Amino acid sequence: MKPVALAVAALVAALSIAFRADAQEPIKIGIIATYSGQFADTAQQMDNGVKLYMKQHGDTVAGRKLEIIRRDSGGPNPDVAKRLAQELVVRDKVDILAGFPTSPEALAAADVSAASQKFMVSMNGTASMLTTKSPYVVRTSFTLPQVAQALGAWAATKGGIKKTYTMVTDFGPGIDGEQYFQRGFKESGGEIIGSVRSPLANPDFSPFVQRIKDANPESIFVFVPGGSQPAALGKAFADRGIDPTKIKIMSSGEAVDETAIKGLGELAIGRLSAQHYDYNHRSPKNEAFVKAYNAEFKRNPDFFSVGGFDGMHLIYEALKKTVGKADGDSLVQAATGMQWESPRGPMLIDPETRDVVQTIYIRRVEKVDGKIVNVDIDKIENVKDPVKASK
């Protein structure tokens, strides 16, 4: 054989070996979450969604094994989340970043995603600006403006509420929620009579709730992050005699998720909320999801759970489209525009913003067959993130 032919044959053989080796290497997914601290339960629920999806669909996609590497931020701690993201990319050589029960940590990790060109799936981070921080970030949760503006408009047009007071946590998602609830409410004819913000870390809600009580509002819109804070705020309302059957209390879903309702008991009855998911949502897809989740984890799923479940669905389907290619450009191109039927209902990854377009459900807490649950009373379909939709 001539030298040139030998060289070509050697090159082809080398490329073939390299291709086979790459095909056999696992795709590494680094999950950053608050596995300890005040938001530990939210991280666990999100991670349960990840685990359930992988149990149902296996750990191999497009001929490549998936390897999950979990890291605890102990947060919310953006600096730690950013360091963990850097370590996952540089030391552990992950292909995909995922997780993020809190927005501050998702925003910090997005800088690493942008710099390293790594695909990143936010399974819960709700700050609207998140997807603008990196062209490789895709969201499978929701944005606070998405639910808050929808709730504000509904309250003024269908809820019979004309005046309200707002109280939110003083960080990105809370400020988003305040601004866009007020926009939806005022544009639909409602009046804001006062606003107050509470700190993110270990807040004492008492003085803020007292200010609201002194204003004697017809209704209140609140946002606090998930975890232990919703029940603590609800108890502060009760301690000061604010009764949701007399003064309408409205919120996004965190304030009336199952954990909060367990902490509040009958104090939760009558509360109104807007959210994209609740385990009590009636559909065959969700009933199957809840049954499987209960069997595996002996508890009900929440919106953190469905965010993790749908986040893994997005990763699996994107990898199928790329036939196992896990670079950021290939995966984000495969993910944008993707549509599927989730336990929450129909989902679309907006091809322009990489946010979720989905149904927002208006719910009221009621006692049904002896159980205190959220009951869907209305829905708003095909809701986009209004921050980007208005630009």
Locate predicted features.
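Extracytosolic ligand-binding ectodomains
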Residues: K2-A9, F19, A23-K391
